[in-house]
Amino acid sequence: MAAAASPPRGFCRSVHWFRRGLRLHDNPALQAALRGAASLRCIYILDPWFAASSAVGINRWRFLLQSLEDLDNSLRKLNSRLFVVRGQPTDVFPRLFKEWGVTRLAFEYDSEPFGKERDAAIIKLAKEAGVEVVIENSHTLYNLDRIIELNGNKPPLTYKRFQAIISRMELPKKPVSSIVSQQMETCKVDIQENHDDVYGVPSLEELGFPTDGLAPAVWQGGETEALARLDKHLERKAWVANYERPRMNANSLLASPTGLSPYLRFGCLSCRLFYYRLWELYKKVKRNSTPPLSLYGQLLWREFFYTAATNNPKFDRMEGNPICIQIPWDKNPEALAKWAEGKTGFPWIDAIMTQLRQEGWIHHLARHAVACFLTRGDLWISWESGVRVFDELLLDADFSVNAGSWMWLSCSAFFQQFFHCYCPVGFGRRTDPSGDYVKRYLPKLKGFPSRYIYEPWNAPESVQKAAKCIIGVDYPKPMVNHAETSRLNIERMKQIYQQLSRYRGLCLLASVPSCVEDLSGPVTDSAPGQGSSTSTAVRLPQSDQASPKRKHEGAEELCTEELYKRAKVTGLPAPEIPGKSS
């Protein structure tokens, strides 16, 4: 996309604007900035005031700053530097255009509503200054607008429908080559002696974060770490040979040296590189057979939520959100605070929230457990509150995936087929019978025997004294009776969906069981796109389920506007909802 005519070759003074996409590999916008350029400056715009006032926590800021340091180090090896410019983009660019004589601005396409609005303002400023603008897509695998177009100009609202659409599309573009020193030789710029003072990567202290007592980072930011992790990740993929889901265990809950989600979120790792490295590995192992879509579950769910959010600026809230069912959640700030601070009295939930606050990451099934507990499982608090807490604490949280996941897990959108209800005792016990995970993050409970580690309130007083932890004194009592509240909340959700279905005469969801089933069986470490479920999920009896095909067809026929009309009828008055608190 160009906002002005391209300058003659050799006279182009380029600026590449890093936002996400914090990498030199597979960066088509950076390659475009280099093409025919006489000079190139790579910038990142950071507003210190925003950093000090935003709700984003210290772990995510640290990861970002580490990623910028790594990017600067990589550019140094190419005889260049990263220019971290302080301020707002709309204030910064008019000054830089004049000061540096910029003739071309390149950046990666941002599909999220806020990003598109910001970029439109910068494109306007560039056009007024006679600066060519080049935008390339590399943060998503597909052209999201094309997916929407193929779905009748509306985003697909089920993952199955999304898969059907992309299966008709061309494969994602292959990653472009990494930047090499020869490309930078002809477009060097003078680096001033005071560069670090003026354009250096700031410290956490400069951004207003206290660092006394800050534990070492569990996740090291940056492209260098991302590529090393990718290699390790693929080495671990021996299971691809038989394509068996890995079994869930206590070690699965800990931060893995092969984990990639924060690196994909910040663009330290290209999703296209990840996609094609998986592709190559599968074809090597399977002797050139075509990889199934399920191989890319992590990437495709990410793509699904990006598609759903791209034209929906209200995607992270209920009000005005055309795809969100308007469920009458309770407002309970005290209960929300206990959940967010890991003080619910359920060790499994509290250990997860403690890990999240300390490290900035939790396993995706742990996310399911705490999301269910906050929303439809136990506390009946809006998913919007969960979005805000995760946005503060989670390294890989972004607008689309974070909000989309919370709507999905709370049964507020994307047509959940089953009413999973993760048991805050049984799920943890099956995953880690010895309770090592709980003892790691809640050391005050380490004296309890495994028998009581997930429900210490049931331990005899003598056991509590021996463990030096009295429940109700040293560790809180459970804030709810899970068996009772989960049954009530399932009934509330059942009423909501029954009324929603009656409104147009469609069965959007299967009928809901009147009691919680606690099924036995192994827990599998599967992604949502691979049909994730656990032994502690509430599943519907097979005899009570509507045909999955019929349900999907009915759901997918709904256009966004029709769904919103239906969703509004679920704002039931309190007396009509069993268990509704005043």
From Swiss-Prot:
Residues 527-546 have a biased composition (Polar residues). FAD binds at residues 261, 298, 364, 396-398. It is found in: Cytoplasm; Nucleus. One of its GO terms (cellular component) is nucleus. Its cofactor is FAD; (6R)-5,10-methylene-5,6,7,8-tetrahydrofolate. It holds the Pfam family DNA_photolyase. Keywords: Biological rhythms, Chromophore, Cytoplasm, FAD, Flavoprotein, Nucleotide-binding, Nucleus, Photoreceptor protein, Receptor, Repressor, Sensory transduction, Transcription, Transcription regulation. GO terms for molecular function: DNA binding; FAD binding; photoreceptor activity. It comes from the Eukaryota. GO terms for biological process: circadian regulation of gene expression; circadian rhythm; entrainment of circadian clock by photoperiod; negative regulation of circadian rhythm; negative regulation of DNA-templated transcription; regulation of circadian rhythm; response to light stimulus. Expressed in the pineal gland. Binds 1 FAD per subunit. Binds 1 5,10-methenyltetrahydrofolate (MTHF) non-covalently per subunit. Residues 521-559 are annotated as: Disordered. Transmembrane segments: none annotated. Residues 12-141 form the Photolyase/cryptochrome alpha/beta domain. Induction: Exhibits some circadian rhythm expression. Levels increase slightly during subjective day peaking at 10 hours. Levels decrease between 14 hours and 18 hours to peak again at 20 hours-22 hours. InterPro entries: Crypto/Photolyase_FAD-like_sf (IPR036134), Crypto/Photolyase_N_sf (IPR036155), Cryptochr/Photolyase_FAD-bd (IPR005101), Cryptochrome/DNA_photolyase_1 (IPR002081), DNA_photolyase_N (IPR006050), Rossmann-like_a/b/a_fold (IPR014729). PANTHER family: CRYPTOCHROME (PTHR11455), CRYPTOCHROME-2 (PTHR11455:SF15). Belongs to the DNA photolyase class-1 family. Transcriptional repressor which forms a core component of the circadian clock. The circadian clock, an internal time-keeping system, regulates various physiological processes through the generation of approximately 24 hour circadian rhythms in gene expression, which are translated into rhythms in metabolism and behavior. It is derived from the Latin roots 'circa' (about) and 'diem' (day) and acts as an important regulator of a wide array of physiological functions including metabolism, sleep, body temperature, blood pressure, endocrine, immune, cardiovascular, and renal function. Component of the circadian core oscillator, which includes the CRY proteins, CLOCK or NPAS2, BMAL1 or BMAL2, CSNK1E, and the PER proteins. This is Cryptochrome-2. The gene is CRY2.
